[in-house]
């Protein structure tokens, strides 16, 4: 099954320590500014998949992360579909305010920080820390930053810094933009809850050091050598080139991380549950008839065992963009 990349876990760690902008605010205009520069100007993003059987129609807009910082997203196709839609499905944002952040840092310090008076270099394998330190200096100019955080959290911060330097952002929320458009069209919105703070804490609490190191390795490979692929993928999304996105395969280290997470950990359970929750939500809307628009991460949609394959297996017709 094609699952969300290890960035899901890294980003979750970022959410927990408050380095993530709340995605619930949305935008006030139909043309939604997604941030600041790899591709500039107004872009439509990819077309939508059309899943249907009988009188039931499901339009799926594939989201992606990271995306170019400097594009303005606007899709006339989305606006047209909203004119005939009964319901919009979007991921429920995980909101953490400053009070929650402080509470987490006080009560869950052992989950997020190294602890015991140690530093990152004391708990991370020497070869990984050497690579981490090299990239940290390259992207931040700071030789001591994040030394008190556990490896997966520190690497998450570094990954976001690298994204920023190359003109990408993982903070851009297509769901929030579609949520705003749905309100303007008077369309009902259903938020699909995929994870809560407790789920993410459990995933971090139960993650074994060997699994953590495997996923840190995957993230470091992303930072060291995979940024060009991510830039290419982000540009393909902005220009609507779905075939290009499908052909840009992830490094083997990412697959190794996913395999480690799947080996009975709470993180693996969380990833599987996210997939199952989305499939159940999409099928429920199809069974209810009418027209639904959903915003779903492309990593969950595409490839063997993705949500589109699941829907085909259940007898639904799936038309590509």
Regions found by a protein language model. Give the residues of each.
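Positively charged n-region of N-terminal signal peptides that target proteins for export
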Residues: 1-6
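Bacterial N-terminal signal peptides
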Residues: 8-19
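Boundary at the C-terminal end of the N-terminal hydrophobic targeting segment
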Residues: 23-26
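Structured, acidic catalytic/metal-binding patches in enzyme active sites
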Residues: 31-41, 45-266
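A cross-kingdom marker for long, charged
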Residues: 260-321
């Amino acid at each position: 099954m094609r699952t969300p990349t290890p960035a899901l876990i890294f980003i979750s760690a970022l959410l927990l320590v408050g380095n993530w902008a709340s995605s619930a605010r949305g935008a006030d205009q139909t043309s939604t500014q997604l941030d600041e520069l790899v591709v500039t100007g107004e872009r439509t993003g990819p077309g939508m998949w059309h899943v249907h059987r009988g009188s039931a129609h499901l339009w799926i807009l594939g989201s992606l992360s990271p995306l170019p910082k400097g594009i303005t997203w606007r899709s006339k196709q989305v606006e047209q579909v909203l004119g005939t839609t009964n319901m919009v499905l979007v991921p429920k944002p995980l909101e953490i305010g400053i009070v929650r952040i402080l509470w987490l840092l006080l009560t869950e310090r052992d989950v997020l920080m190294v602890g015991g008076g140690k530093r990152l270099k004391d708990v991370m394998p020497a070869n990984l820390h050497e690579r981490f330190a090299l990239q940290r200096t390259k992207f931040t100019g700071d030789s001591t930053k994040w030394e008190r955080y556990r490896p997966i959290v520190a690497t998450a911060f570094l990954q976001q810094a690298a994204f920023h330097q190359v003109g990408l952002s993982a903070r851009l929320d297509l769901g929030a933009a579609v949520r705003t458009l749905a309100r303007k069209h008077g369309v009902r919105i259903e938020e699909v809850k995929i994870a809560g703070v407790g789920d993410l804490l459990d995933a971090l609490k139960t993650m074994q050091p060997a699994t953590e190191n495997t996923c840190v390795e995957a993230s470091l490979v992303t930072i060291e050598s995979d940024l060009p692929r991510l830039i290419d993928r982000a540009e393909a999304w902005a220009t609507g080139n779905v075939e290009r996105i499908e052909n840009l395969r992830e490094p083997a280290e990412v697959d190794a991380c996913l395999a480690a997470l799947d080996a009975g950990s709470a993180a693996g359970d969380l990833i599987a549950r996210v997939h199952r929750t989305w499939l159940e939500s999409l099928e429920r809307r199809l069974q209810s008839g009418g027209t639904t628009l959903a915003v779903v991460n492309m990593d969950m949609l595409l490839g063997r065992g993705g949500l589109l394959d699941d829907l085909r297996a259940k007898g639904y017709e799936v038309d590509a963009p």
